[in-house]
A protein has these predicted regions:
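Divalent metal-coordination and catalytic microenvironments
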Residues: 48, 77, 107-108, 141, ...
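Methionine residue identity
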Residues: 1-6
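Short N-terminal helix/helix-N-cap motif within the alpha/beta-hydrolase-1
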Residues: 54, 82-87, 114, 187-188, ...
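Acidic, His/Gly-enriched loop-helix segments that form or flank divalent-metal centers
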Residues: 132-238, 242-248, 258-268
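Residue-level marker for buried hydrophobic side chains located in beta-strands
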Residues: 45, 72-74, 104-105, 177, ...
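N-terminal active-site segment of His-dependent metallophosphoesterases
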Residues: 15, 19-91
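Active-site neighborhood of divalent metal-dependent phosphoester bond hydrolases
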Residues: 81-167
Length: 285
């Protein structure tokens, strides 16, 4: 079975069984309180990383983040599948601790990891109710976490546990909601939906709030789509460009620039859309 076919199968199974993974959310939503409500030059969102730490570090260098003028939100799914999930988590943690205007959300893979750890700890490879995490790329994360000193692994796990599942800010009176997967138009603020939802969100959301998401690779949303972020007409910005897929990228989207451009009222050109994005390619991509 090819990589894309295996991805589709795992994604399908993962979606069906997602509600087996219950995380007690300590923080449902974070707001732009650190920034004091001021206007940011750039409002940035980084899509799914999935253990591609080297690629993320190259992307970070391209972004040239400025804490005095920028806001940046990591959209979750730092772990699993790629070669360096623990180093990816550590990198994200360092940025949130170093910069007041960098925020990191929880993704569904982090939620699966926490459910597994809460059920079994890190010392054993259990194949049972929670083996879906291991089957969806969690084995390398479990192995690397288990290799850390106990105190270090516990601290990193606690960092993950404290991630909010959404973040809100605004730009020139337009509300912006950052979540990993999306929102359910029929059920407001359900944590599971914010981590897991796919089709119902993309087909059913028509709200006034701009919703910025990862989770679903843009290559999966449109069959002919290149690995680039999508700016959809129903106020959705899709940032996951399939970091671990054969043609994948890690993408950073400047949401503020996109909103400024679309206020002109004309249909954005491909060049204008591209000007809202920075990307890095995994070495094996």
């Amino acid at each position: 079975m090819g990589r894309m076919s295996m991805y589709a199968l795992c994604g399908f199974v993962c979606d069906i069984l997602s509600y087996h993974f219950h995380v007690f959310y300590d923080i449902i939503e974070a707001r732009d309180e650190k920034g004091g409500g001021r206007m940011f030059r750039r409002i940035l969102a980084v899509g799914d990383v999935h253990g591609e730490a080297d690629c993320l570090e190259r992307l970070w260098a391209k972004i040239a983040f400025d804490d005095a003028h920028d806001l940046l939100v990591f959209l979750g799914d730092y772990i699993d599948r790629g070669p360096a999930p623990v180093r990816t988590l550590q990198f994200v943690q360092r940025q949130t601790e170093k910069y007041r205007n960098v925020h990191a959300l929880m993704g569904n893979h982090e939620a699966m990891m926490l459910s597994y750890i809460d059920a079994y700890g890190m010392g054993h490879t259990i194949m049972g109710q929670f083996d879906l995490w291991l089957a969806n790329g969690g084995k390398i994360t479990r192995k690397q976490l288990a290799a850390l000193p106990t105190a270090e692994a516990k601290a990193l796990t606690e960092f993950v546990r404290q991630r909010p599942i959404s973040f809100r800010t605004s730009h020139e009176d337009e509300e912006i909601l950052f979540v990993h997967a999306g929102v359910n138009p029929a059920a407001e603020d359900r944590g599971e939906d914010m981590l897991w939802i796919r089709e119902e969100f993309f087909k059913g959301y028509y709200g006034d709030t701009v919703v910025v998401v990862g989770h679903t690779p843009t290559q999966r949303l449109r069959r002919d789509c290149a690995p680039v972020p999508l700016f959809l007409p129903n106020n959705i910005v899709a940032c996951d460009t399939g970091s671990y897929l054969p043609d994948g990228r890690i993408s950073c989207v400047d949401v503020a620039r996109y909103l400024r451009l679309r206020r002109s009222g004309h249909r954005l050109s491909s060049e204008e859309r591209a000007s809202c994005c920075v990307q890095a390619v995994p070495r094996n991509g």
